[in-house]
Amino acid sequence: MRLDKFIAENVGLTRSQATKAIRQSAVKINGEIVKSGSVQISQEDEIYFEDELLTWIEEGQYFMLNKPQGCVCSNDDGDYPTIYQFFDYPLAGKLHSAGRLDVDTTGLVLLTDDGQWSHRITSPKHHCEKTYLVTLADPVEENYSAACAEGILLRGEKEPTKPAKLEILDDYNVNLTISEGRYHQVKRMFAALGNKVVGLHRWKIGDVVLDESLEEGEYRPLTQSEIEKLVK
């Protein structure tokens, strides 16, 4: 691994900030000051930042987070805090989300440092299903289930959505399971049906269900069974 990448991930800096710190003699490898961020390092090396020994994070980290409203799933956003505020560095710098939720959508987000694993979840060819609890502004109509099962043509698109499963819970709440990830898909599906989504909560990805014991903003590691369920 490059030294500047390691420093950025472990200290919580951008790559350019890490490079600047290295040039300013803030980093030592095995007791020697190093001023080049391109130096390759390994876990056998002792890396110091401002005289503090940094620890290596093992590869293969998998978590579920109960995302609250008001934060985004990107690593950096000028308008909203990100979900990575809930994780301490150096861990936060190594994770990415396997799929995203809008700023006003709550619920299950999966995070990992394993790119191949997350690709299996997000790639359209794997058809990983996601289930949402949807709260609507107007009462549910009888034709919604059939319309979702047949596919709905969204505004501005040429192809209808893939068949989706809709379970009516009461007059204003439904569970919707989709296998795509189009832009604002759930909201646009109900807009096409003449309704409006006023609450959206993802509680299931594949066969993994959001842990009910997690408060908003809390996370826990996935079990080995959960990790394997998502790539079976």
Swiss-Prot record:
The keyword Magnesium does not apply. One of its GO terms (biological process) is enzyme-directed rRNA pseudouridine synthesis. Its EC number is 5.4.99.19. Gene3D superfamilies: Alpha-L RNA-binding motif, Pseudouridine synthase I, catalytic domain, N-terminal subdomain, RNA-binding S4 domain. Pfam families: PseudoU_synth_2 (PF00849), S4 (PF01479). It comes from the Bacteria. One of its GO terms (molecular function) is RNA binding. It is an enzyme of class 5 (isomerase). It catalyses: uridine(516) in 16S rRNA = pseudouridine(516) in 16S rRNA. GO terms for cellular component: cytosol. The active site is at 102 (nucleophile). Belongs to the pseudouridine synthase RsuA family. Responsible for synthesis of pseudouridine from uracil-516 in 16S ribosomal RNA. This is Ribosomal small subunit pseudouridine synthase A. It comes from Haemophilus influenzae (strain ATCC 51907 / DSM 11121 / KW20 / Rd). The gene is rsuA.
